[in-house]
UniProtKB/Swiss-Prot annotation:
Chief localization: cytoplasm
Domain SH3 stretches: 1-58, 98-157, 311-372
Annotated Gene Ontology cellular component terms: cell-cell junction; cytoplasm; cytoplasmic vesicle membrane; cytoskeleton; endocytic vesicle; focal adhesion; GABA-ergic synapse; glutamatergic synapse
Residue ranges of coiled coil: 643-708
Domain of life: Eukaryota
Tissue: Highly expressed in spinal cord.
Keyword Kinase belongs to the record: no
Subunit details: Can self-associate and form homotetramers. Interacts with MAGI2, PDCD6IP, CBL, GRB2 and PI3KR3. Interacts with CD2, F-actin capping protein, EGFR, MET, BLNK, MAP3K4, SPRY2, ARHGAP17, CRK, BCAR1, SOS1, ASAP1, ARAP3, HIP1R, SYNJ2, INPP5D and STAP1. Interacts with E3 ubiquitin-protein ligases CBL and CBLB, but does not interact with CBLC. Two molecules of SH3KBP1 seem to bind through their respective SH3 1 domain to one molecule of CBLB. The interaction with CBL or CBLB and EGFR is increased upon EGF stimulation. The interaction with CBL is attenuated by PDCD6IP.
Extent of Polar residues compositional bias: 513-528, 579-590
Region of interest called Disordered, as start-end residue ranges on this chain: 221-242, 289-309, 373-487, 511-651
Topological type in the membrane: Peripheral membrane protein
Protein name as catalogued: SH3 domain-containing kinase-binding protein 1
Localization: Cytoplasm; Cytoplasm, Cytoskeleton; Cytoplasmic vesicle membrane; Synapse, Synaptosome
Length: 709
């Protein structure tokens, strides 16, 4: 027959439920799934929630029903919390009884609800049962409650057996009424401040508030439960006069139904904290028999963390300086030795390191990894002991180690500062002793390394002019066209000088051309004339040739037409040019200016133009250069005029053809649209006719109906 004691009040919500109060005993319980049990109380049978009661074992039940004792005052400990709040019962400890499972707290935890335990690192909890996945029920410092199972580490069964054997040895060597110290919540202190009782595990309270000669003999007998909300436990103790007493179970305030309402409409929120070993809760070992390694010693996590960090420490050398842009970044200078802390940062392409006692991130392509044996050199000082504080602050030792490290860096290549312009990132340089096969992608905020310009030239170079081609050369010209114009139109001998001059001008760039307001004169005016030769015509005198009407720079539209005509009709120009030019022809062509030296030299370089110039009677003798210079200029002027007229007429014809085609397209489109509209109108007209006929028929039917009546 299963019986249970009520731990929380419950008011019946339905007819088949029981109204239970704290302290009542329910009998004839039949366990059912779903969180509800069926039992009998005060002659009435019904259902009740299983997490509002605690199952009672037979031996505990007899003690509860038979023995009662007056309440004892609560004792204050250093924390001010009331301990030993319930009365205790004395029951002789069964020597062969097995201990419960025990676990040690690995992470501190603050309770979120009333039925949860507060965990501190190093506490030992006796596990009552596993209520559900992730939550266990246990006893800690006389209080029963829930705790998260992932905040503790379970002690092995070997330690439990060792604890039992030690208790047996202690009980044999001690008086009959003496209790093992492992069952006491606090140790008693003698007159000299030493503990009177020693056992498997002792917890030390604050010495200032503990009464030295007070002894708490409390035997904690925690009953097993399948529910989760149990908080009180049945305990036994022996007073000074040996009286036996039964405890009045103290109820606990509950805000909701089931598990203390810890999962009501909210996800489970657990706040893990860093492992901090508190000296006040370190267990004390008993030297009798074997020691308890898992329960009595907890390694210092900060020490192990420091050891593992120093074992895998890497170093890198700064090859490019970088100025920190954010607070979490490091300012590194060329040649610094940075201690690597983490290569797997959130931002790809960034590493975390330490320099001069400051930690931060820096771009990985600004540094070079040092070989692994760099850390093993003998001249490095020994590692200082780890500090007790969590904040690692290395003083003069760090700077001294840094200076000694910097004495032995790998040699830097001499050609590193003089980087060529094609290299934009330091990854393209061959990196030695790198563990990564490839460089990661550039992060969004990662800067580019600076460029070193070894040529001392401006950042943007002017466009370099290529060699003079055989065909027509079409490119943008600046204000220097006036300088090139006179020499090319008047003399074929000056081609070499003009080419050298144009190359010099182009190397300077278009922005460096300075316009001149002086009028140009013919270069051959001061030369002596050959005897027996026909003087040049009046239109080719120095005054006429240097007149601003001929040598004025053309407008951009005329310049564009010159390029188009000479590019497409370079061969026609040489065929259509005549050997004799009259004054009237020159005067008629004043509006059209001669071409620039680059285009004229290209147009006259063809084989046809060269043969025509060689066969002309005016250029047969090579007496002077003054008369020969006039022939190519006049030929080119006449050919240019004809070419421009032909090009303009052809352009007009093409434009007219385009307009005709556009008009045809528009007319065709209008025809199609008109046809569609006519069809649509015809269809609508047919529909209207049908509707009208239908209405007419209906009207006739109505008339006939009216007449028949």
């Amino acid at each position: 027959m299963v019986e249970a004691i009520v731990e929380f009040d419950y008011q019946a919500q339905h007819d088949d439920e029981l109204t239970i109060s704290v302290g009542e005993v329910i009998t004839n319980i039949r366990k059912e799934d779903g969180g509800w049990w069926e039992g009998q109380i005060n002659g009435r049978r019904g259902l009740f929630p299983d997490n509002f009661v605690r199952e009672i074992k037979k031996d505990v039940k007899k003690d509860l029903l038979s023995n009662k004792a007056p309440e004892k005052p609560m004792h204050d400990v250093s924390s001010g919390n009331s301990l030993l709040s319930s009365e205790t019962i004395l029951r002789t400890n069964k020597r062969g009884e097995r201990r419960r499972r025990r676990c040690q707290v690995a992470f501190s935890y603050l309770p979120q609800n009333d039925d949860e335990l507060e965990l501190k690192v190093g506490d030992i909890i006796e596990v009552v049962g596993e209520v559900e996945e992730g939550w266990w029920e246990g006893v800690l410092n006389g209080k029963t409650g829930m705790f998260p199972s992932n905040f503790i580490k379970e002690l092995s069964g070997e330690s439990d057996e060792l604890g039992i054997s030690q208790d047996e040895q202690l009980s044999k060597s001690r008086p009959e009424g003496f209790l093992p110290a492992s069952l006491l919540p606090f140790p008693a202190h003698g007159a000299k401040g030493k503990t009177t009782f020693e056992g498997t595990i002792l917890y030390r309270a604050a010495p200032g508030k503990t009464e030295g000669h007070r002894r708490y003999y409390s035997l904690r007998e925690t009953t097993g439960s399948e529910s989760d909300g149990g908080d009180s436990s049945s305990t036994k103790s022996e007073g000074a006069n040996g009286t036996v007493a039964t405890a009045a179970i103290q109820p606990k305030k509950v805000k909701g139904v089931g598990f203390g309402d810890i999962f009501k409409d909210k996800p489970i929120k657990l706040r893990p904290r860093s492992i901090e070993v508190e000296n006040d809760f370190l267990p004390v070992e008993k030297t009798i028999g074997k020691k308890l390694p898992p329960a009595t010693s907890t390694p210092d996590p900060s020490k192990t963390e420091m050891d593992s960090r120093t074992k895998t420490k890497d170093y890198c050398k700064v090859i490019f300086p970088y100025e920190a842009q954010n607070d979490d970044e490091l300012t590194i200078k060329e040649g610094d030795i940075v201690t690597l802390i983490n290569k797997d940062c959130i931002d790809v392409g960034w590493w975390e390191g330490e320099l001069n006692g400051r930690r931060g991130v820096f771009p990985d392509n600004f540094v070079k990894l040092l070989p692994s044996d760099f850390d093993k050199e003998g001249n490095r000082p020994k590692k200082p002991p780890p500090p007790s504080a969590p904040v690692i602050k290395q003083g003069a030792g760090t700077t001294e180690r840094k200076h000694e490290i910097k004495k032995i860096p790998p040699e830097r290549p001499e050609t590193l500062p003089n980087r060529t312009e094609e290299k934009e990132r330091p990854e393209r340089e061959p990196k030695l002793d790198l563990q990564k096969p490839s460089v990661p992608a550039i992060p969004p905020k990662k800067p580019r390394p600076p460029k070193t310009n070894s040529l001392n030239r401006p950042g943007v170079l002017p466009p370099r002019r290529p060699e003079r081609p055989v065909g027509p050369l079409t490119h943008t010209r600046g204000d220097s066209s006036k300088i090139d114009l006179a020499g090319s139109t008047l003399s074929g001998i000056l081609d070499k000088d003009l080419s050298d001059r144009s190359n010099d001008i182009d190397l300077e760039g278009f922005d460096s051309v300075i316009s001149s307001t002086e009028k140009l004169s013919h270069p051959t005016t001061s030369r002596p004339k050959a005897t027996g030769r026909r003087p040049p015509s009046q239109s080719l005198t120095s005054s006429s040739l240097s007149s601003p009407d001929i040598f004025d720079s053309p407008s951009p539209e005329e310049d564009k037409e010159e390029h188009i005509s000479l590019a497409h009709r370079g061969i026609d120009v040489s065929k259509k040019t005549s050997r004799t030019v009259t004054i009237s022809q020159v005067s008629d062509n004043k509006a059209s200016l001669p071409p620039k030296p680059g285009t004229m030299a290209a147009a006259s370089s063809g084989p046809a133009s060269l043969s025509s110039v060689a066969s002309s009677p005016m250029s047969s003798s090579l007496g002077t250069a003054g008369q020969r210079a006039s022939s190519p200029s006049l030929f080119s002027a006449e050919g240019k005029a004809k070419t421009e007229s032909a090009v303009s007429s052809q352009a007009a014809i093409e434009e007219l053809k385009m307009q005709v085609r556009e008009l045809r397209t528009i007319i065709e489109t209008m025809k199609d649209q008109q046809k569609r509209e006519i069809k649509q109108l015809l269809s609508e007209l047919d529909e209207e006719k049908k509707i009208r006929l239908r209405l007419q028929m209906e009207v006739n039917d109505i008339k006939k109906a009216l007449q028949s009546k």
